[in-house]
């Protein structure tokens, strides 16, 4: 289990995620997993929660769709979600993906949905609700922070509450064009 949080703020979109991998409900198998990656010529950043093998499959599918649609993230995400919804094998995948580029911030769910957040914040994983609430609070009341600082602190707060999230946090960001 994990927590991934992405924030779009002041011309920057950032993502933060912890590195904990849990087997079952109680065994911490790893604390430094890389759940945030750059794809499509480093123009798209993704973060995932759920089964690692499932997430890698979704990453490969999204990369293929990005290649097919010349890097158009919104179109690639919709096409990926449609494939995910129609394919019985893909429907069994248990993962969620946050994807963003210099224009869009999207959540691609296991139900084949593509959502753009209302408050410029999206969070997934076992600590996702905690991170999302923390990030929205910081966006509303904490001036002077960057998107990256907000995302990282939101995951830190989630890690304080959620036993399946650790404090080994990795961040990445893209400036809007």
Swiss-Prot record:
An example Gene Ontology CC term for this record: proteasome core complex
Enzyme's top EC category: hydrolase
Entry keyword set: Allosteric enzyme, Cytoplasm, Hydrolase, Metal-binding, Protease, Sodium, Threonine protease
Amino-acid positions noted as binding Na(+) in the UniProt annotation, renumbered to this chain: 159, 162, 165
EC number(s) recorded for this UniProt protein: 3.4.25.2
Listed Pfam families: Proteasome
Chain ranges passing through the membrane: none
Catalyzed chemical reaction(s): ATP-dependent cleavage of peptide bonds with broad specificity
PANTHER family noted in UniProt: ATP-DEPENDENT PROTEASE SUBUNIT HSLV, METALLOPROTEASE TLDD
Self-association and partners: A double ring-shaped homohexamer of HslV is capped on each side by a ring-shaped HslU homohexamer. The assembly of the HslU/HslV complex is dependent on binding of ATP.
Protein name stated in the entry: ATP-dependent protease subunit HslV
Taxonomic path: Bacteria, Bacillati, Bacillota, Bacilli, Lactobacillales
Gene transcribed to yield this protein: hslV
């Amino acid at each position: 289990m994990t927590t991934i949080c992405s924030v779009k703020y002041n011309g920057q979109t950032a993502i933060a995620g912890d590195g904990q991998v849990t087997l079952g409900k109680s065994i911490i198998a790893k604390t430094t997993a890389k759940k945030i990656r750059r794809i499509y010529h480093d123009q798209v950043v993704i973060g995932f929660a759920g089964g690692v093998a499932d997430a890698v499959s979704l990453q490969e599918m999204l990369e293929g769709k990005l290649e097919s649609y010349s890097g158009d993230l919104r179109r690639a995400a919709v096409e990926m979600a449609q494939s995910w919804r129609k394919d019985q094998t893909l429907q069994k995948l248990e993962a969620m993906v946050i994807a963003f580029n210099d224009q869009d911030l999207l959540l691609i769910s296991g139900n084949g949905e593509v959502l753009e957040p209302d408050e410029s914040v999206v969070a997934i994983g076992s600590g996702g609700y905690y991170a999302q609430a923390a990030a929205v609070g910081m966006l509303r009341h904490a001036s002077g922070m960057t998107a990256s600082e907000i995302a990282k602190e939101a995951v830190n707060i989630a890690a304080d509450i959620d036993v399946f999230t650790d404090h080994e946090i990795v961040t990445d960001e893209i400036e809007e064009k």
